[in-house]
Amino acid sequence: MIKIAVLGYGIVGSGVVHVLDKNAERIYKNAGQRVDVKYILDIRDFPDCPYNSLFAKDFETIVSDPEVTVVVEVIGGADAALTYTRRCLEAGKSVVTSNKELVAEHGSELLKLAMEKGVNYLFEASVGGGIPVIRPLAQCMTANTISEIYGILNGTTNYILTDMERNGAEFSAALFEAQNKGYAESDPTADIEGHDTCRKICILSSLAFGHHIYPRSVPTEGITGVTINDMRYAAALGYKIKLLGRSRAVGEKVSVYVAPHLVNKHSILAEVDDVMNGVVIRGNAVGNVVFCGAGAGKLPTASAVVADVIDAVKHLYARKWISWTDGSEDLIADPVLLASAWYIRTDASCEKVEKEFGSVLFADDTGSETAFVTSVMNGKMVSELLNRGIKAYSQFRILGDH
């Protein structure tokens, strides 16, 4: 029997304990050993919890117990979680986490420490919730050279954009609705400003390209600038608006950014609506591989965490090879130099737009505004043309017909 500890009994932590309990026989069959929760660490009291006897308030009890071989860290944040993770790895315990902030900021350090101690640091649930994307990228696609990753990585923003598109809701109303349904936090900043998506694309990019991509190096734009008019014009032009995290190999460097994009309404990602997530990974042998599913939620995320627990149990004496080196600003390419078509909304006349941009595709029925799609050009060129007297109210890349 394998003894484990769960650090944190919030939404994900309680889901993990629930899945381990309710699916115990299935987990035993897949892991080859019984998996027993010995401790749940939380400073709060849960007097009515059926697992009340398992609670501990002192981390030292857990880290010093030689019976505990796998620790699940679902505290969140990068403060106490970092300290606890380091201590557990140093003590020779494998760690499983859903903590995207911790992996995005400290992944290279923690993977190196796990390697030195001969244990595992696993984080399938840190990206995509219940969607299996880390393991396929790290194992099933290792014969490929990855050239690009892009996707809808945040369910909150995708729900808001879907509500705006379908129901004509203003951004503020769509956000309020998302909060009422529990899809958005009371402070939604990390979601709507793109920080959550940034952390996730950093993790995927670090794994795919082999060196740590730090969130601070990634230009990040959220969805607060997307308007109802943008939604209407995009639809008229044959597109939907989605917030994407995107990374692309540029020679020996990697270009990574987060921003709203117009995606072709007939593309796969255009069909990923509401709180669903979708990720596309392009390999030079396999082509495009698409992963879609529930990107958040108690049980979908717990499902991914428990899958990693099973993996850790099966590899107690054989380390899984998941690693990347530390990163450097020298390895990051500026996305402003990436070429694409662009959607622009302005109050400039069609004549002025055509004078500066040449042949463009205009949206119909835009009233006093002008909305158009440019030919393919990089962001630097777009800025130069706009500086000739065209004020852009919105400026989004076109993903293309992927």
Residue spans of the language-model regions?
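A conserved regulatory-domain signal marking ACT and ACT-like small-molecule sensing domains
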Residues: 309-402
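Catalytic, metal-anchored helix/loop core of enzyme active sites in primary metabolism
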Residues: 146-150, 158-161, 165, 177, ...
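General beta-strand structural signal in soluble alpha/beta enzymes
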Residues: 55-56, 73, 96-98, 121-125, ...
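Rossmann-like NAD(P)H-binding beta-loop-alpha module
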Residues: 68, 115-196, 203
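Rossmann-fold NAD(P)-binding glycine/threonine-rich loop
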Residues: 81-87, 91, 98-138
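N-terminal glycine-/serine-/threonine-rich beta1-alpha1-beta2 phosphate-ribose binding loop
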Residues: 1-90
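Substrate-binding/catalytic subdomain of NAD(P)-dependent oxidoreductase enzymes
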Residues: 175-271, 276-278
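Conserved active-site and cofactor/substrate-binding residues in soluble primary-metabolism enzymes
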Residues: 7, 11, 15, 35, ...
